[in-house]
Amino acid sequence: MLLRDLVLRHGCCWPSLLLHCALHPLWGLVQVTHAEPQKSCSKVTDSCQHICQCRPPPPLPPPPPPPPPPRLLSAPAPNSTSCPAEDSWWSGLVIIVAVVCASLVFLTVLVIICYKAIKRKPLRKDENGASVAEYPMSSSPSNKGVDVNAAVV
């Protein structure tokens, strides 16, 4: 399809295309006639001859040598037979005790704050619906002051 489109677009290509198609088989025949017959079968007979090229193909190049092993960048370890001094376990114990004590202090403060928040008296509603806080240190109920949130009627 592509070849037909190419040929139809360019009308001048017909002669070169026909020449190519005619000479292509001849070129293959010329290549075959320049080769020598070689007997390659186990039984040597006239019917068992194959056409091969005169020279054998060149040998393959040898494979490249393997890469050298990687070198270590770190210094070699010292050949010491004595054991290194062990770190004291007291420093780890001190850190653990400090973390536990800090956690206990935090939890105690948290419990105290929550206890005081629960014990505090809730807000009571005034007669007109405004919220008034009751605190233990406040004045007696007979001594009522003017509420700031109270609406004047």
UniProtKB/Swiss-Prot annotation:
The chain crosses the membrane at residues 93-113. Isoforms 1 and 2 are expressed in the adult brain. In matured cortical neurons, only isoform 1 is detectable. It is a single-pass type I membrane protein. Pfam families: PRIMA1. One of its GO terms (molecular function) is protein-membrane adaptor activity. Its main location: membrane. Residues 56-70 form the PRAD domain. It comes from the Eukaryota. Residues 36-92 are extracellular. Glycans are attached at residue 79. GO terms for cellular component: anchoring junction; membrane raft; plasma membrane; synapse. The keyword Metal-binding does not apply. Residues 59-79, 133-153 are annotated as: Disordered. Residues 114-153 are cytoplasmic. Residues 1-35 form the signal peptide. It is found in: Cell membrane; Cell junction; Synapse. Residues 59-71 have a biased composition (Pro residues). Keywords: Cell junction, Cell membrane, Disulfide bond, Glycoprotein, Membrane, Neurotransmitter degradation, Signal, Synapse, Transmembrane, Transmembrane helix. One of its GO terms (biological process) is establishment of localization in cell. InterPro entries: PRIMA1. The proline-rich attachment domain (PRAD) binds the AChE catalytic subunits. Required to anchor acetylcholinesterase (ACHE) to the basal lamina of the neuromuscular junction and to the membrane of neuronal synapses in brain. Organizes ACHE into tetramers. Interacts with ACHE, probably through disulfide bonds. This is Proline-rich membrane anchor 1. The lineage of its organism: Eukaryota, Metazoa, Chordata, Craniata, Vertebrata.
